[in-house]
A protein has these predicted regions:
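Alpha-helical transmembrane segments of multi-pass membrane proteins
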Residues: 13-27, 55, 82-86, 127, ...
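Hydrophobic, glycine- and aromatic-enriched re-entrant/interface helices and adjoining loop segments
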Residues: 103, 194-296
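Membrane-helix boundary/helix-loop-helix interface segments in multi-pass membrane proteins
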Residues: 2-6, 28-165, 344-357, 363, ...
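Loop-to-helix entry and N-terminal half of a specific, functionally important transmembrane alpha helix
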Residues: 314-355
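Hydrophobic alpha-helical transmembrane segments
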Residues: 46-54, 292-313
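Hydrophobic alpha-helical segments of polytopic membrane proteins
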Residues: 71-77, 149-160, 168-208, 214, ...
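Interfacial segments of multi-pass membrane proteins
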Residues: 172, 177-191, 269-295, 356-369
């Protein structure tokens, strides 16, 4: 039995695109930091090649053996322990960003444990939900009691990630995965809706507990309010309208970069907003930088590649006879989909920016390797299905 070649090729093409733009978009960053011109390119090339090899070697494992289960549980436990100890590591062993330690330094590279934790979490939920949730109809109270232990643990673990790493984006993704996979496992729509309500309430509490987040939400709403206020009654307009608002610097230049690229772009390597105007253009704002250079047409091609990859994973999931494999593949597809849209909507101000990487495109080894582990597992599972 062979793994699915289409998924492997689609993933490899996206990785290659990410490698190319790690060189093009980092032109100013390497000068500013005093690095060699090929610093980010060589590192991303190494991440990409090793990621493809990870996919290939994992795909050779038999998914019906205990090895798959042991590897995924080990990934979950090791990454979870790393997340716990990360805030207590000395500065020479941990890299900080946004006022919080998020990476563990291992020689010349830094590892973000939360990226690997998400993959382990998806497998654990697939395995555990299969044992606890079935397709039989139950009263909403019974379903809540089944899901309650997961919610309690999720609030504790995800809350710890949010507090210690100040990373709302990863927390939102993790909570979404827990709810969505419960639905895929057989939970009712009522339970899913109930979970969304609870998650929304928790989200509001988190946002309004921080003045900085209130200001970010206010700035975001101020940028898009003109599209919605005409549909609101006058009394509501008076309440929600933001009178004084300044467009965030990064979002402003992100939108300008996209507009400057037009339909066909300025040409590979010819973007100007990467030259100090738009920071983090090779990481969080990679889609804006790419669009400036290859235009909306080029961006559309990338979106189509992503869509084909995600649909392929869903197709593999739909053909799985093993329920654990079905839920796991669905979780990987949802992770890719949700991460892509969180970033894409954030850089054009449709949603608040959360600093979530674009899978396979954004510069960084942790995101690359974790996604390649997930894709390798899907490829491994694809050997057991008829496509």
């Amino acid at each position: 039995m062979f793994a699915d070649k289409k998924l492997f090729y689609l993933s490899s093409i996206l990785i290659t695109i990410g490698i190319v733009f790690s060189y093009s978009l980092s032109a100013f960053t390497v000068l500013y930091l005093g690095y060699d011109d090929f610093h980010f390119f060589i590192r991303q090339l190494a991440f990409g090649i090793s990621g493809i090899l990870i996919m290939f070697f994992i795909s050779q494992i038999n998914p019906d053996t205990a090895l798959f289960h042991k590897l995924m549980i080990a990934l979950l436990l090791i990454s979870f322990i790393a997340i716990i100890i990360l805030p207590f590591l000395p500065a020479n062993l941990a890299t900080a960003s946004g006022g919080a330690k998020r990476w563990i330094r291992l020689g010349p590279i830094s590892i973000s444990p939360v990226e690997f934790f998400k993959i382990g979490l998806i497998y654990f939920l697939a395995w555990s939900y299969t044992r606890r949730i079935d397709d039989s109809k139950k009263a909403i109270k019974s379903e809540i009691l089944i899901l309650l232990p997961y919610m309690i643990v999720a609030i504790i673990v995800i809350g710890y990630i949010y507090i210690t790493q100040n990373d709302l984006g990863q927390s939102v993704i993790s909570f979404f995965i827990i709810l969505a996979l419960a639905f895929f496992a057989g939970a009712s729509k009522k339970l899913f809706a109930f979970g969304l309500v609870i998650a929304t309430m928790i989200g509001f509490l988190v946002i309004f507990s921080s003045q900085r987040r209130i200001e970010r939400i206010s700035n975001w709403w101020g940028n898009i309010q003109d599209a919605f206020l005409p549909f609101f009654p006058d009394w509501l307009v008076q309440i929600v309208k933001v009178s004084s608002n300044s467009e965030p610097y990064q979002i402003s230049h992100s939108l300008n970069a996209i507009a400057h690229g037009g339909f066909f772009g300025e040409g590979l390597g010819l973007g100007i907003f990467k030259l100090g105007f738009l920071s983090e253009v090779h990481t969080d704002f990679v889609l804006a930088g790419i669009t400036e250079e290859i235009g909306l047409v080029g961006l559309a091609v990338i979106c189509i590649l992503y869509l084909l990859m995600i649909l392929r994973i869903f197709k593999i999931a739909g053909r799985c006879e093993n329920k654990v494999h079905f839920i796991f593949c669905s979780g990987v597809a949802l992770l890719l989909l949700f991460s892509f849209f969180m970033n894409a909507f954030g850089i054009i101000s449709l949603t608040p920016l959360k600093g979530v990487a674009v899978p396979l495109l954004s510069y960084g080894g942790s995101s690359m390797w974790s996604i390649c582990i997930a894709l390798g597992c899907v490829l491994m599972i694809s050997k057991k299905v008829k496509l």
